[in-house]
Swiss-Prot record:
InterPro entries: Carb_Metab_Trans_Reg, Zn2-C6_fun-type_DNA-bd_sf, Zn2Cys6_DnaBD. PROSITE patterns: ZN2_CY6_FUNGAL_2. Residues 7-50 bind DNA. It is found in: Nucleus. It comes from Penicillium sp. Residues 160-174 have a biased composition (Basic and acidic residues). This is Transcription factor grgC. Keywords: DNA-binding, Metal-binding, Nucleus, Transcription, Transcription regulation. SUPFAM superfamilies: Zn2/Cys6 DNA-binding domain (SSF57701).
């Protein structure tokens, strides 16, 4: 058995062993545990013995030897059988055949089957079953060009009549308009709450509340035009040109916007009234007013915008007699038709005091929801006219104001 080519110290330190062959047997005589190799330079410098150990035989077998032994079809049940042979040598079931490493027994006959007796592990198994036909799965491996019959992708009609797709509410234009009207009413109420906050700056044309009043009025007018437009796609038994639920929602949104217009006028009126207080009071408190000539000019433009929006809503509400044919009011008690209310006839409409008291919650018994709604609709032209008068009064007040 030969010695290693590196000394034990260099192998332990995992460095290269440097030797001087000229110093072979003189400085390192042969002795037990030592070889005839010359000592390495590292051991000489360290002053230690340079020892070369003998090579040891490795007990690990190579991968090729393991594979060759495991797949050797030699003895199957002997003591030298590999793990693969021992695993395959076990029967698949009780009383079944043994399977060897060459898998040759797989094509043999199973004991007990076909001999007239039942197999212990297959009680109840039909031994007369026919083998699978080779052509049974031919369609699975058919060429691409072979006509194997089209696969139907049509929805099944045996689902009890229910739609296979879920209904999308966003596709319904009526629901979309209803959502827009609800959002407009909420925006108007939030704007009115902001207008009554204390210590707020005077309104201008670019104030958020004024911008919302302009945008929401344009949106409401566009929705009202859609509601009153004829629906040519309506093929129902009772065709109508107006969706009544949307009409009531639009009227409710109109009332919110009119209330917002009135709140804007009230905010301007409060600012103007604050300037009529004695100047001595402001001098004692040391406060200066934010309302000046520039604010008055902004007030004038805001009021002109409100007047323009009211006139536009008038034209949209009372477009023509033909567009109001489905909005003509019917008397609850007699069922007779009444003339549509237009701006020209608005001043001649006099609401019934009894109905107004009933709507206000007095002791007079109310006539029902229809009577209340009819009274509200009849007062819409009067509300517009009163709002115009308030705007004109504010404009006149600012013309004679001392802030110019």
């Amino acid at each position: 058995m030969s010695h290693r080519q590196s000394c034990d110290r260099c192998r332990q330190q995992k460095v290269r062993c440097l030797r001087d062959e000229a110093l072979g047997g003189e400085s390192n005589p042969v002795s037990p545990g030592r070889s005839s190799l010359s000592p390495c330079e590292r051991c000489l410098k360290a002053g230690v013995d340079c020892v070369y150990s003998l090579k040891q035989r490795s007990n690990r077998r190579s991968v090729q030897t393991s594979i060759r032994r495991d797949t050797d079809p030699g003895s199957r049940n002997g003591s030298n059988a590999s793990w693969l042979e021992q695993g395959l040598a076990r029967p698949m079931y009780q009383g079944g055949p043994f399977l060897g490493a060459d898998l040759g027994d797989l094509v043999g006959q199973f004991s007990g089957v076909g001999e007239g007796g039942p197999v212990a592990s297959f009680n109840g198994w039909d031994a007369n079953l026919q083998p699978f036909s080779p052509t049974l799965f031919s369609s699975l491996v058919a060429p691409v060009g072979t006509n194997t019959g089209p696969i139907s992708t049509a929805p099944s009609t045996t689902d009890g009549g229910h739609d296979s797709e879920e209904i999308d509410d966003n596709r319904d234009p009526t629901d979309a308009l209803s959502s827009q009207l609800t959002s407009l009413g909420q925006r108007a109420r939030r704007a009115m709450r902001r207008l009554v906050l204390p210590d707020r700056t005077p309104l201008t044309v670019s104030s958020p509340e004024v911008n919302e009043a302009l945008e929401d009025t344009n949106t409401l007018i566009r929705i009202m035009n859609k509601i009153t437009a004829p629906d040519r796609d309506d093929i129902t038994i009772f065709p109508t040109t107006t969706n009544y639920s949307l009409a009531f929602s639009a009227l409710a949104c109109h009332q919110h916007l009119v209330a917002l217009f009135r709140a804007i006028c009230d905010a301007i009126h409060r600012c103007l009234q604050s300037q009529k207080e004695p100047r001595q009071r402001h001098n004692r408190s040391g406060q200066t007013s934010d309302v000046g000539p520039s604010s008055v000019a902004q007030f004038v433009m805001v009021l002109q915008l409100l007047m323009h929006l009211i006139n536009r809503m008038d034209r949209s509400l009372f477009q023509s007699t033909s567009s109001m044919r489905h909005g003509s009011r019917i008397s609850v008690s007699t069922g007779s038709h009444l003339a549509p209310v237009t701006p020209s006839t608005a001043n001649h409409v006099t609401p019934d005091p009894t109905r107004i008291e009933a709507a206000a919650g007095s002791s007079v018994p109310p006539g029902g929801l229809l009577v209340l709604v009819q009274d509200i609709v009849e007062t819409i032209p009067n509300e517009h006219e009163k709002l115009r008068q308030v705007i004109q009064k504010l404009q006149t007040e600012m013309e004679h104001s001392e802030l110019h």
